[in-house]
Amino acid sequence: MNCLFCKIAENKNERLTIFEDDMVVVIMDKFPICDGHLLVISKNHYETIMDVPNDVLTHMFDVAKKYALIDMKVLNETGCSFSINYGTKQEIKHLHLHVMPNYNVKPSKNVEEVYKLIMEGLNEEEKKI
């Protein structure tokens, strides 16, 4: 399979990983539309939200909620948007959930700087990926 997100889920060296378990991986978006823009990516390949089993989708949102709270805390934000694109808006045909604190503000930091802030904000248990 020639799927970018399948490759990302398999290769830890090419991404800024925030969290990983047996169902999902959370990474910094390579092309963020705001500071702290995260992607929660299903490890198994599901092309759309219509294809994913409910337990995986529920888990994706549970993980997104947890890391959105951390993201907002370290960036001093008060709000967050969650988004799953479907159909013509879906650029990569692999299910992923966007987590975007303060969605209306353009990025002011580089991805590595925000990654460092988030990782510093995690407690020791959460750092054990």
Feature map (PLM): residue ranges:
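HIT superfamily nucleotide-processing domains
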Residues: M1-I129
